[in-house]
Amino acid sequence: VFQALKAKGILVGIASGRARYGVPQEVQNLHADYCVKLNGAYVKDDAKNIIFQAPIPADVVVAYKKWADDMGIYYGMAGRHEAVLSTRNDMISKAIDNVYAQLEVCPDYNEHHDVYQMWTFEDKGDSLHLPAELAEHLRLVRWHDNSSDVVLKGTSKALGVSKVVEHLGLKPENILVFGDELNDLELFDYAGISIAMGISHPLLQEKADYITKTVEEDGILYALEELGLIDKELQFPQLDLENHTGPKVTIKTNHGDMTLVLFPEHAPKTVANFLGLAKEGYYDGIIFH
């Protein structure tokens, strides 16, 4: 899909809540023109030039850690090149290991590195709220029964994508996006065309301009073909023409009879096309040009 789009001069990008080191290698190998990571806090192009970055202020990180410790909440921190945990237990492992495997424990990580995103690890669910002094700077985005992303207020996938759009001198109406989760809501509000995957959050589907098939059904490819951004590859069935019982037409030519097997799904006007070509002079009595 990426190569087909690039061949038409269309730039492609990936916007994710994850950092690059949490993205599967096969996705990295696609070489997207732009990558919006960590819910919009870090944006790079394929040449690894930084387009935009918004680390969480150091004093806000310290204040968050103190609040988490006071509340008995475990936490994690995501930097530019790695992420770490405040501790390790079964609850944390079940939440984070499918996204970032084998993270080290380093509660003092922020003392020597910029932090772009943090996490809570707890069993409080949607009842968890930041205190007012932290809520001025941070917001929680629940993504797991036992964890929320803790992101800088104002950052989002939409912000990161907008920085790419500004960098390219484009406008939001020049952008088409796909999404499936709640952290895509702001992105759907921003982009000119928004497409929800087949099994996506109901709130996201309400905002979508178009709902495609599921990931397993190649929903992205399907939507791009339907919109004409990628040429649809026609799949003609291989048939035993001698024994085929479907519709056929025979055209008399100077070189003998030409028998065509008709596939209504792909070429319902085959005969009309041949007649039209003949009438318009593309048939000189010997061959079609």
PLM feature spans:
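Short hydrophobic/aromatic-enriched beta-strand-loop microsegments
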Residues: 32-40, 54, 95-97, 140-142, ...
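Short, acidic/turn-prone active-site loops that include or flank metal/cofactor-
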Residues: 39-42, 144-148, 199-202, 216-220
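Short, structured coil segments at secondary-structure junctions
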Residues: 30-31, 39, 133-137, 190-191, ...
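Cyclophilin-like peptidyl-prolyl cis-trans isomerases
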Residues: 232-289
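Conserved acidic, metal-coordinating active-site core of Asp-based
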Residues: 67, 71-190
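Active-site phosphate-binding/coordination module
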Residues: 1-92
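Phosphate- and divalent-cation-binding pockets in alpha/beta enzyme and binding domains
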Residues: 21-25, 129, 160, 186-187, ...
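Acidic, Mg2+-coordinating phosphoryl-transfer loop and its flanking beta/alpha structural elements
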Residues: 16, 161, 171-215
